[in-house]
Amino acid sequence: ESVLGGTDELLTGGLVDFAVTSSVPPGYLGDLLMTIPIVAAAAPHHPLHQLGRPLTQRDLRRHRHLVIRDTAQRRKRETGNWLGANQRWTFSHKASQIAAACMGHGFAWFPIDTIRTELDSGRLVRLPLREGAERRAELYLVHADRDCTGPAATRLAKIIRASVAKACAGRGEAGAAE
């Protein structure tokens, strides 16, 4: 598993046959797999939920932002650090980030499917943002060099495309063509 620049490094370094990534590195072509809604969420007892009004960017900046560490070796950045929060905790794993949010240690931007169980159980609640309550990220399947990809990797890429298309169709969303 890699995040942000780490995925680009794996592709450009020839260490993987293909990758699923939210950005296509310069010089590569990618096939759109799906679009993912991303939402801000925190535990129901978090102070942001206690304000009782739509939240502003200023409100978010005053609270701890939980972000995921970039796996890149050369250039690092944290995911979800768009707001420049005064406080932030950086995690290496999504599960740790989700657990910290559920415990009320801060808020984070999550792909909605990643926290579906926590939202359904009430352990996390979407933040009532005045604007920008939902973002979207696109996921692409990018081959390092399609002509050099072996039969197993080619088959796996085809299975991923088909699985994503089926899952998206089951939810009434547009997804990858098989």
Question: Which role does the model predict for each range below?
Answer:
Residues 1, 8-9:
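Short alpha-helix C-terminal cap/hinge motif
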Residues 1-2, 90:
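Glycine-rich beta-to-alpha transition loops that act as phosphate-gripper elements at the mouths
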Residues 3, 152:
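Conserved alpha-helical elements of sugar-nucleotide-dependent glycosyltransferases
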Residues 8, 25-26, 30-105, 110-135, ...:
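C-terminal regulatory
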Residues 13, 17-18, 106-107:
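Short, Asp-centered acidic motifs that coordinate Mg2+ and/or phosphate
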Residues 14, 144, 163-166:
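Generic structural signal for alpha-helix termini and adjacent loop/cap motifs
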Residues 41-45, 138-151:
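A bilobed periplasmic-binding-protein/Venus flytrap-type ligand-binding module shared by bacterial periplasmic
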